[in-house]
Amino acid sequence: MKTPHILMMAAGTGGHVFPALAVSEELTKRGAMIHWLGTPNGMENGLVAPTGYPFHAIEMQGLRGKGIGRLLKMPVTLLSATMAVIKIIRGNNIDIVVGFGGYVSAPGGIAARLTKTPLIIHEQNAIAGMSNRYLAKMATKVLQAFENTFGNSQLDAKLETVGNPVRNAITGVAEPIARYDINDCSALKLLVVGGSLGAQVLNETVPKALALIESPFEVRHQCGRNNEAATQAAYDEQDLSMHKFTVQPFIDDMAAAYNWADIIVCRAGALTVTEIQNVGIAAIFVPLPSAVDDHQTANARTLTLHKAAILLPQNELTPKRLSEELAALDRPACLEMAKKGHALANRQACQHVANIIWQAL
């Protein structure tokens, strides 16, 4: 078998890029040559660069909520981007195109169709994005992380639920039963994560909630870049003498952070929800209310419906409410929640997706 050349499409957010990177690593081990399709200034540039994969940048932007001007320009932008991807496919002898989402997926998928190159798409969220809903009709294979994401019986013949691929470091974290000591009476360890950019509402609310709790917590708070001083000030303004807390702009080693924590308060992006499932950790989800189609709430419900997490909508998030949710948890309760989430995880998702791609070559 000649070396297969695979074009991975993932751009815009870590929720698209990290699963694609995990699968790319697995495919590289099997002898594939990975090419990456992204945008010139997207976060994928920095994430893909260390891998050494050839990076192909095209000009493409999002459409929803961007105004009439961008809408009018979209046909020309899409045509130009599609032609650029056709050149990439033909110029690099691409054998298969795999889309994990982001603005580049639409022109990439159309280019695959026009060049008669097999196309596989993967949807990470519980509600499919606009590009993937469109591309599903022309894809060779449609993969979804959660059941009923597409909800279209016409896709049944090519639709498969596979979970979300995550990095080996995450799947390597010890199981909940090995991490939670129900006889440990020390302070619960609280991890607060608002995504790579942070979440202002969490930065402001968590310190006030802790001030209302009578039992001690040890807190590690990722506040987002450029938010460290303001978040530190929010903690310093409260009487938190019984608590220990650390504020940092970004956590590089999330596997270690998950391993440390008893409870996490966070948004509900697909990657975050999947990692929490894989690790098995008690979670309070505060979905981003502005997320397209409210997909973060749908993501969170894949756990909360099984009592494997707590859903706290942002419009209900107050210091008092958050303090009540946190105060009601102890290690035995955290362990039960963590075990339920862990039981729902698909820890072979990366290998499963890689197998499907390999078989389609």
Swiss-Prot record:
GO terms for molecular function: UDP-N-acetyl-D-glucosamine:N-acetylmuramoyl-L-alanyl-D-glutamyl-meso-2,6-diaminopimelyl-D-alanyl-D-alanine-diphosphoundecaprenol 4-beta-N-acetylglucosaminlytransferase activity; undecaprenyldiphospho-muramoylpentapeptide beta-N-acetylglucosaminyltransferase activity. It catalyses: di-trans,octa-cis-undecaprenyl diphospho-N-acetyl-alpha-D-muramoyl-L-alanyl-D-glutamyl-meso-2,6-diaminopimeloyl-D-alanyl-D-alanine + UDP-N-acetyl-alpha-D-glucosamine = di-trans,octa-cis-undecaprenyl diphospho-[N-acetyl-alpha-D-glucosaminyl-(1->4)]-N-acetyl-alpha-D-muramoyl-L-alanyl-D-glutamyl-meso-2,6-diaminopimeloyl-D-alanyl-D-alanine + UDP + H(+). GO terms for biological process: carbohydrate metabolic process; cell division; cell wall organization; lipid glycosylation; peptidoglycan biosynthetic process; regulation of cell shape. UDP-N-acetyl-alpha-D-glucosamine binds at residues 13-15, 125, 167, 196, 251, 270-275, 296. It is found in: Cell inner membrane. Keywords: Cell cycle, Cell division, Cell inner membrane, Cell membrane, Cell shape, Cell wall biogenesis/degradation, Glycosyltransferase, Membrane, Peptidoglycan synthesis, Transferase. Its main location: membrane. It is a peripheral membrane protein. Pathway: Cell wall biogenesis; peptidoglycan biosynthesis. GO terms for cellular component: plasma membrane. Its EC number is 2.4.1.227. Signal peptide: none annotated. Belongs to the glycosyltransferase 28 family. MurG subfamily. Cell wall formation. Catalyzes the transfer of a GlcNAc subunit on undecaprenyl-pyrophosphoryl-MurNAc-pentapeptide (lipid intermediate I) to form undecaprenyl-pyrophosphoryl-MurNAc-(pentapeptide)GlcNAc (lipid intermediate II). This is UDP-N-acetylglucosamine--N-acetylmuramyl-(pentapeptide) pyrophosphoryl-undecaprenol N-acetylglucosamine transferase.
